[in-house]
């Protein structure tokens, strides 16, 4: 009931304390809160604030039916975003792929330069650092020590930490399941995605023989220190508990991807250190899910950060246009209950 009307405005309380305070049962924690909160926030209950755990629950399950819809790309992300890149280029945007920036600098005339690793220098009137927090800190560290942008933002960076994700890719010689995806309970694996079935929606030719499954382990702190073989063996054993066909199937190919810096952790008390997009000042803007979006470390938060940064740049040019899409409206009875 705590989250029916909304969620806390402050982020000081860890979600583990809320679970204890509201006397959640072990079964409720294992079979509901773990799949939902660990899967969404990619962290342990001790490292998640009640504010953002409550937001996930309220927005996904209570506020509206639309908020709980799950979108799964039916193609690799590199292809998924290719159309966006092509559209940007048609509008005059220049994209420099496989290019890293070594340093940035503020010019006397108020413009900015970004120097790439190949020595090329790019100049702009406004500069948006749309980067993870550690890369933002790296580039801010290339500014002069007395630079106001460095002094305003860099000290807050020490309060941010990462959480890892591990994905296991398995190619079997036969069909394992007809499900497109599934949440797995009482396992280290939170989600199974049937990539063979999901990609059939692309409509691009015949589906390959066998089946390709992707398994996701959120908050995979233990797996970061495990070997590839240990992770694979444990994952296959857990998968077989739900899909017995696995035991008689042959694994044709497999892969394990550990992302130690997958997301930032919404640890209790972090909100006070999350900068607004225009917090740096001087035509330097910040974007990234870790900035002050009002959302946790999710794709929704990342999209909001980009739009908020674009709004800030537009404001600097005297344009007050809103680019942030409105939040989903409450529906049904929730219209009366949502704060």
Name these PLM-found stretches:
Residues 23-33, 148-157, 245-252:
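Short, surface-exposed acidic
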Residues 95-97, 129, 286:
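A structural signal for the hydrophobic beta-strands that form the central parallel beta-sheet
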Residues 1-104, 112:
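Active-site/ligand-binding neighborhood in enzyme catalytic cores
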Residues 180-339:
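Conserved flavin/dinucleotide-binding core of flavoenzymes
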Residues 8, 70-73, 77, 120, ...:
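Aromatic-acidic/polar surface patches that form glycan- and anion
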Residues 99-246:
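Mid-domain catalytic core of redox enzymes
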Residues 87, 94, 135, 142, ...:
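Active-site catalytic microenvironments for nucleophilic, acid-base chemistry
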Residues 21-23, 40, 139, 242, ...:
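Alpha-helical structural context
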